[in-house]
């Protein structure tokens, strides 16, 4: 009997029947590896393999086998996922698997009926699928029930773990698991699932911290890459492509057809997906909305059927579910324009193509998006399309470089050449989460002495780098502002201001949200926007344009009607960080003469033109370029964090360095004013500063309040500045790059 046969025979009948029903001819390598760790050891497990490789089944087959052989007297498994839609998707998959087993599965989040949840509370058994926010609510509001609900908990499965490591939300989960362990009195095995992860050992440590268990990371077998990949480039041919026909007529302009029809880039993207079941990814909700509206206009103008859907976090649950169901339906043809919400592992069946509008920000994002296509034995297929303004004769040098195209090529080459994936960034000082968990623990446990509260909170894994004296600063601030209150017995309880925060359901989430206004058309909920336009104004949402008919400010409702046209909409947001390796590879692309086989004709021509510019202007030899007169440009080829540090360093020492008028674009270049011939003196002085060591703390001004996370507004400024310098700036890379640039002289 082979090892695979032994594992198969160990599974109960309902799992074997599931395997037969799905016509699997054999267990996959990831399923064999998972079975070995979960059956033969007491280790934690991190599974990293491509989308649709059977990771979920790999984890659950052995776990459910144990629950079948040795039933749990409480909830036996917690499955945590970052999206409600992912939980809904997995719920139906696991429910199908468990149909004949007698093992219960319950999904629990804000959209699930109270009656469904009540059944679990009355009889806690089986598998609980839950979001971090709902788990937080359970810890606060049902603290006394935790031992009964989870007393015999065996496993915690964390899905899409790459989206959580290095974030407040991921650290919140680690706090929650530690708190559950504390309340039930025993450790629980952890299983992490991820399609792409840049630092598996780092993620394994993240998963294991505080458990005392080793985490096994089976090596996924990386075969030869099989992709269908293409990149094409277009210049923006019609600058009025952001304007609707109604707007044009309002401005006294005559236009026969929608402006998008005159733009070859949009036409090309439309043709790429019009006959293929596709996902179209953009890097922001604004771009997603605009592109979906553009596709609909082109379809209307050509007389084609409108098959275009949209999916992002500001849409109503019903609209998102409509897109998911239509994409899953094998009999229905659809194209969905999406953001990161469709990047994760929601099963959408057989997808023929992924279209990427501009370059993704990360290798991780590229692989996740590419992996959404190519299931059932077919290679993944992606087309990246780039659009930029056609440079004018007097366009400055830095704007002659196609940064998006370079980034797209760099991301692909880094994975092909090195299998590089960005490692997760680790936060050392998550003060926003520290504020949140302080209130959460006090709300759950009741009165604690300051010493007991500090001991409990600072023992949680995310806060091991926080000094006691810094936590004391936070606690005093919380006392002074009524978030905490001291009793006559010198104990701490939640104060009046803290109670107000805790009363809102929004408290359970540690990611930043906004006070959104709900948009309704008749009885249908369309989605949410941040700022309400005046009555009569128009805005875009769900790939369509709406005109405001009525505002209900007290209830935060906007009543609208649908109108023709296309407009832009803006949401606040952070576009994420780009790794230094991507910038370094972009430089090599610009300076080498390699012809990349996936570049289409226009993209090849655009890259050749950029290489010609780089060679003629000296970019191939120098990072600091004289643009003429007093204008200079520095190309440091640093990622977001290091670029941010260098920019602050130049600003702080500008007078000493003899520079002024500092401006920048993304993390690509910095321009400034300086006397002609001052470059050597500038770099020599920068080297002297680097030799003394760059103090990141000194780059944050005394009055600065760097607010980024949800509860940063409640954290003292001195702690925010300390966290910013520690977690958002970096000195070593900048010091090295300064020496490298000086070496060019």
Name every feature range the model reports, one short phrase each.
Residues 2-8, 12-18, 29, 33-53, ...:
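Helicase motor core with emphasis on the C-terminal RecA-like subdomain
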Residues 17, 379-381, 502, 514, ...:
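Terminal, basic amphipathic appendages of nucleotide-handling enzymes
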Residues 109, 217-222, 306-308, 313, 556-561, 663-681, ...:
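A generic structural motif
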Residues 262-266, 272, 327-335, 339, ...:
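Phosphate-interacting basic helix/loop segments used at nucleotide- and nucleic-acid interfaces
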Residues 419-545, 550-551, 627-644, 654-665:
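C-terminal accessory/connector segments of nucleic-acid motor ATPases
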Residues 641-647, 677-684:
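Short, conserved charged micro-motifs
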């Amino acid at each position: 009997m082979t090892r695979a046969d032994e594992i198969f025979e160990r599974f109960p009948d309902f799992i074997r029947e599931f395997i037969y029903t799905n016509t699997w001819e054999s267990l996959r390598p990831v399923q064999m590896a998972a079975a070995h760790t979960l059956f033969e050891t007491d280790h934690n497990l991190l599974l990293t393999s491509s989308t649709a490789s059977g990771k979920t089944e790999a984890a659950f087959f052995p776990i459910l086998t144990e629950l079948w052989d040795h039933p749990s007297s409480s909830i036996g498994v917690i499955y945590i996922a970052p999206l409600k839609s992912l939980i809904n998707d997995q719920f139906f998959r696991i429910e199908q698997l468990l149909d004949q087993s007698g093992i219960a599965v319950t999904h629990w989040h804000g959209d699930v009926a109270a009656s469904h949840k009540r059944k679990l509370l009355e009889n806690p058994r089986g598998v609980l699928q839950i979001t971090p926010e709902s788990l937080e609510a359970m810890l606060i509001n049902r603290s006394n029930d935790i031992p009964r609900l989870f007393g015999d908990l065996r496993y915690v499965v964390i899905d899409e773990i790459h989206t959580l490591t290095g974030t407040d939300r991921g650290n919140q989960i680690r706090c929650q698991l530690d708190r559950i362990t504390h309340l039930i009195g025993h450790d629980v095995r952890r299983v992490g699932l991820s399609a792409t992860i840049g630092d598996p050992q780092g993620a394994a440590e993240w998963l294991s911290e505080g458990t005392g268990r080793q985490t096994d990371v089976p090596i996924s077998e990386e075969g030869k890459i099989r992709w269908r990949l293409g990149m094409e480039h277009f210049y923006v041919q019609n600058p009025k492509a952001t304007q609707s026909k109604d707007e044009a007529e309002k401005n006294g302009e005559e236009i026969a057809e929608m402006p998008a029809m005159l733009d070859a880039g949009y036409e090309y993207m439309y043709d790429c997906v019009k006959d293929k079941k596709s996902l179209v990814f953009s890097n922001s909700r604004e771009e997603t909305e605009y592109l979906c509206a553009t596709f609909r206009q082109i379809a209307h103008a050509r007389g084609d059927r409108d098959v275009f859907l949209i999916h992002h976090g500001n849409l109503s649950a019903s609209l998102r579910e409509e897109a998911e169901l239509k994409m899953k339906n094998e009999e229905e043809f659809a194209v969905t324009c999406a953001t990161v919400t469709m990047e994760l592992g929601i099963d959408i069946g057989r997808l023929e193509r992924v279209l990427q509008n501009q370059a993704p920000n990360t290798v991780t994002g590229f692989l996740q998006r590419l992996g959404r296509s190519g299931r059932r034995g077919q290679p993944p297929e992606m087309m990246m399309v780039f659009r930029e303004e056609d440079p004018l004769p007097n366009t400055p040098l830095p704007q002659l470089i196609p940064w998006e195209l370079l980034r797209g090529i760099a991301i692909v080459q880094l994975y092909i050449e090195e299998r590089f994936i960005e490692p997760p960034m680790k936060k050392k000082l998550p003060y926003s989460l520290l504020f949140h968990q302080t209130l959460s623990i006090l709300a759950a446990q009741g009165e604690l002495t300051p010493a007991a509260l500090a001991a409990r909170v600072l023992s949680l894994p995310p806060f091991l780098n926080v000094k006691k004296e810094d936590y004391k600063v936070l606690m005093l601030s919380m006392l002074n502002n009524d978030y905490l209150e001291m009793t006559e017995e010198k104990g701490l309880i939640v104060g009046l201001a803290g109670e107000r925060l805790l009363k809102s359901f929004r408290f359970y989430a540690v990611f930043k949200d906004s006070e959104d206004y709900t948009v309704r058309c008749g009885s249908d909920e369309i989605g949410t926007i941040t700022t309400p336009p005046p009555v009569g104004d128009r805005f875009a949402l769900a790939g369509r344009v709406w005109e405001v008919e009525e505002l209900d400010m007290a209830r935060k409702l906007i009543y609208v009607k649908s109108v023709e046209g296309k407009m832009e909409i803006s949401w606040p947001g952070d576009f994420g960080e780009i790794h230094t390796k991507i910038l370094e590879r972009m430089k090599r692309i610009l300076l080498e003469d390699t012809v990349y086989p996936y570049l289409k004709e226009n993209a090849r021509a655009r890259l050749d033109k950029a290489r010609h510019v780089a060679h003629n202007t000296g970019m191939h030899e120098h990072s600091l370029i004289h643009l003429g007169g007093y204008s200079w440009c520095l190309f440091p080829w640093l990622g977001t964090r290091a670029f941010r540090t260098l920019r602050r360093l130049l600003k702080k020492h500008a007078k000493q360095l003899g520079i002024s008028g500092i401006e920048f674009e993304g993390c690509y270049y910095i321009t400034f004013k300086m006397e002609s011939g001052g470059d050597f003196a500038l770099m020599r002085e920068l080297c002297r500063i680097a030799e003394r060591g760059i103090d990141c703390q000194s780059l944050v001004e005394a009055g600065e309040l760097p607010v980024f996370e949800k509860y940063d507004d409640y954290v003292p400024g001195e702690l925010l500045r300390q966290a910013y310098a520690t977690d958002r700036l970096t000195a070593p890379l900048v010091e090295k790059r300064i020496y490298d640039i000086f070496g060019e002289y």
